[in-house]
Design a protein with these regions (language model features):
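Positively charged, small/polar-rich N-terminal and surface patches that mediate targeting and assembly
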Residues: 1-115
Length: 115
């Protein structure tokens, strides 16, 4: 059976909704928080001591990563897309790529069984 890696870079405040949407669909997932710069509007930040405001160089984002067998890809991608959607530029991007093999370190299982 073939496997796919799904990586979704989303707005930081959507991680809870995305987590809730996929937690019962996948064996596990990882969320990495970071900063990103894309098409969305960046936050305006007030300077210290009333010195004015400036536009942040980056937005707070999160990348949700999981590996699933081919049969689950469409459902997981749709769930992430629906949960992360606001209709504004900067909602994020979902990338799906092929995974040749996976190995569970603790159980020594390989392929889809490792998931």
């Amino acid at each position: 059976m073939r496997m796919k890696r799904i990586e979704a870079t989303i707005q930081h405040d959507k991680t809870g909704a995305v987590s809730d949407a996929i937690k019962d669909m996948v064996g596990g997932f990882t969320i990495l928080e970071g900063n990103g710069r894309g098409s969305g509007e960046r936050q305006t930040i007030r300077g210290g001591r009333g010195t004015g405001t400036f536009v942040a160089e980056f937005n707070k984002v999160a990348t949700v990563s999981t590996i699933v067998d081919d049969s689950k890809v469409e459902a997981v991608v749709n769930a992430i897309s629906d949960a992360a959607y606001s209709g504004k530029a900067g909602d994020g991007i979902i990338i799906v790529s092929t995974v040749d093999d996976a190995r569970n370190i603790a159980s020594k299982k390989r392929g889809v069984e490792a998931l």
